[in-house]
UniProtKB/Swiss-Prot annotation:
Name of the protein described by the UniProt record: Glycerol-3-phosphate dehydrogenase [NAD(P)+]
Organism: Enterococcus faecalis (strain ATCC 700802 / V583)
Domain of life: Bacteria
Binding site for sn-glycerol 3-phosphate: 107, 138, 140, 193, 246, 256-258
One MF term in the entry's GO annotations: NAD binding
This protein's record includes keyword Lipid biosynthesis: yes
Length: 340
């Protein structure tokens, strides 16, 4: 059944998801706050800054007016930076006339509160103005989705029927969705993998080989699982698409902003230079701070996250940081046991 979807955020991922929805026959309106970008989408059907080669379906409309984007919508898809989630959700709540499903595909933790994105949205959009909230996450580069490369991700909601709705909304012959009811696990994996990707990029920038890259990914996954379980997640989620799947794709590809930023840090560039060079939001930088603070609060050991925090915020030398983490006291590998 044809649905009307408002896509909030015309970045690379928002644009790619809008394309999927339009190609599936849905009515799509993209909202953004840059008039020149919105005009480009409407008149040229391109978004050159983010996806230079993509020609968008002509059925996609775009607007800078949020109220217009939200008229008669069946679903609202948030794809804005984590730092903008609360303010955009507040605005959305003012304009909603229908009770749409809320979907978000952003990855991070809110600064200061350390809250997951679905928690922030739930606080700002009252239950009487919406249906459930669904998290869309997994191993997915926008650049590959835009050219129809096969991609599989997860739709997670406490209400599985809402996750199934999103599954049916997006699925086609190149974009497959699996459902999950572990919202905490899916959101935690989505946010924290960006931290580990910064480290993986730094490892590459320092000139280390595959052994080191494998080490940071596997021990990074242990940290993600450790914090996630402390927050109430199912540990099995972290060996799925939104856990190890997203970690692999983010830690091994030049498409990953966080990997590229880490690579520059490993080559000796300062954080300010790196962010200026990137020209796009690098979610892992702010997420590192939030995760470090949350780990302290929950008394969860996260040595890789702590090391990356010190590099980013205490100006610790990357080479020295790599040595220090290797010289920590010995540990056991297995932390969780599963009863079958």
């Amino acid at each position: 059944m044809k649905q009307k979807v408002a896509v909030l955020g015309p970045g690379s991922w928002g644009t790619a998801l809008a394309q999927v929805l339009a190609e599936n026959g849905h009515e799509v309106c993209i909202w953004g706050n840059k008039p020149e970008q919105i005009d480009e989408i409407n008149t040229k059907h391109t978004n050159k800054h983010y996806l230079p080669e993509l020609i968008l379906p002509t059925s996609i409309q775009a607007t800078t007016d949020l109220a217009t984007a939200l008229v008669d919508v069946d679903a609202v898809l948030f794809v804005v930076p984590t730092k903008a989630i609360r303010s955009v959700a507040q605005e959305v709540a003012q304009h909603l006339k229908t009770k749409p499903i809320i979907i978000h595909a952003s990855k991070g933790l809110e600064q200061g509160t350390h809250k997951r994105i679905s928690e922030v949205i739930a606080e700002e959009i009252p239950a009487e103005k919406r249906q459930g909230i669904v998290v869309l996450s997994g191993p997915s580069h926008a650049e590959e989705v835009a050219v129809h490369d096969i991609t599989t991700i997860t739709a997670a909601s406490e209400n599985l029927a809402d996750a199934v709705y999103v599954q049916e909304l997006f699925m086609n012959d190149y974009f497959r969705i699996y459902t999950n009811d572990d919202v905490i696990g899916v959101e935690t994996g989505a946010a924290l993998k960006n931290i580990i990707a910064l480290g993986a990029g730094a490892i590459h920038g320092l000139g280390f080989g595959d052994n080191a890259k494998a080490a940071i990914m596997t021990r990074g996954l242990a940290e993600i699982s450790r914090l996630g379980v402390a927050m109430g997640a199912n540990p099995l989620t972290f060996i799925g698409l939104s856990g190890v799947g997203d970690l692999i794709v983010t830690c091994t590809s030049v498409h990953s902003r966080n990997w590229r930023a880490g690579n520059l840090l490993g080559k000796g560039h300062k954080l300010d230079e790196v962010l200026e060079n990137m020209g796009m939001i690098v979610e892992g930088v702010s997420t590192t701070k939030a995760a470090y603070e949350l780990a302290q609060q929950l008394e969860v050991e996260m040595p890789i996250t702590e090391t990356i925090y010190n590099v980013l915020y205490n100006d610790e030398d990357v080479q020295q940081a790599a040595k220090e983490i290797m010289l920590r006291d010995g540990k056991t590998e297995n932390e969780f046991t599963l009863d079958f």
